[in-house]
Amino acid sequence: MLAVELVIVLLAIFLGARLGGIGIGFAGGLGVLALALIGVKPGNIPFDVISIIMAVIAAISAMQVAGGMDYLVQQTEKLLRKNPKHITILAPIVTYFLTIFAGTGNISLSALPVIAEVAKEQGIKPCRPLST
């Protein structure tokens, strides 16, 4: 029985990875449904955690549509290009504040290409500002 459950979970993960975006959530729901159909008893639903995650996703989606993420990345680029010598110190600080302002660390992924580009222009290995 454990092998069947493992196969269902892995198939749901694979399907979600192939679909991407909102499909990840649908694949997870499909996996839970399949597990319930074979008799696995679901546990208590953590509504508090789900509500927090949904609120953060809704907020970041609204910010993306309104252009807020683009604005924050533009401000990041301005700051890093004005102070390129200090990129090793500024890059982690900027990504920290992006995470605080957006409520999720996913916005930091938008700033990584900017950080890498400015570092390369200064002759600094991009791994230094990206890893600190």
Swiss-Prot record:
Reaction(s) the record says it catalyses: fumarate(in) + L-aspartate(out) = fumarate(out) + L-aspartate(in); fumarate(in) + succinate(out) = fumarate(out) + succinate(in); (S)-malate(in) + succinate(out) = (S)-malate(out) + succinate(in); L-aspartate(in) + succinate(out) = L-aspartate(out) + succinate(in)
One GO cellular component, as annotated: plasma membrane
Membrane topology reported for the UniProt record: Multi-pass membrane protein
Compartments where located: Cell inner membrane
Domain of life: Bacteria
Pfam families attached to this UniProt entry: DcuA_DcuB
Protein family (similarity comment): Belongs to the DcuA/DcuB transporter (TC 2.A.13.1) family.
Protein name: C4-dicarboxylate transporter DcuA
